[in-house]
């Protein structure tokens, strides 16, 4: 039983570490916007597990694991004008890759990724956009952001 618990704790686990929607100021040059506004939706995703999302080097070499994906669910009257609705974000390393020797070497943040969309929708009334992040080995998470 102890071995099974250890394996479960080492498994990859995706988390949405931040999700924001910020209005984008655009120059309309006097054109009518019909009450719509442009929003920048950003989602930060991290693998908080010990193992990478691909789990093993062998699976990575054989390209056996589908990538992490992020997808938006939009309210009526909203549309994505920058980016695709479903975005493939690749694989994320886990905490096993972190250096613990105190060296000055910086590997960046291979355990994190940022997805960004531009969404056009009416600002009033407030509308909700649901972000779904999923990976076949690291799970699925959802979060809602409000525009307007």
Can you say where each PLM-predicted feature lies in the sequence?
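C-terminal accessory segments enriched in acidic
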Residues: 1-30, 34-148
């Amino acid at each position: 039983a102890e071995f099974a618990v250890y394996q479960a704790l080492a498994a990859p686990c995706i988390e949405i570490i931040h999700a924001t929607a910020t209005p984008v100021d655009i120059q309309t040059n006097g054109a009518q916007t019909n009450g719509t506004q442009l929003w920048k939706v950003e989602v930060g995703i991290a693998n908080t597990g010990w193992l990478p999302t691909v789990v093993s080097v062998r699976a990575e070499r054989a390209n056996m694991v589908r990538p992490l994906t992020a997808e938006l669910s939009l309210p009526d009257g909203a549309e994505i004008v920058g980016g695709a609705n479903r975005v493939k974000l690749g694989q994320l390393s886990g905490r096993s890759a972190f250096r613990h020797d105190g060296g000055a070497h910086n590997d960046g943040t291979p355990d994190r990724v940022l997805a960004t969309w531009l969404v056009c929708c009416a600002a009033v009334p407030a509308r909700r956009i649901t972000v779904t992040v999923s990976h076949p080995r690291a799970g699925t998470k959802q979060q809602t952001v409000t525009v307007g």
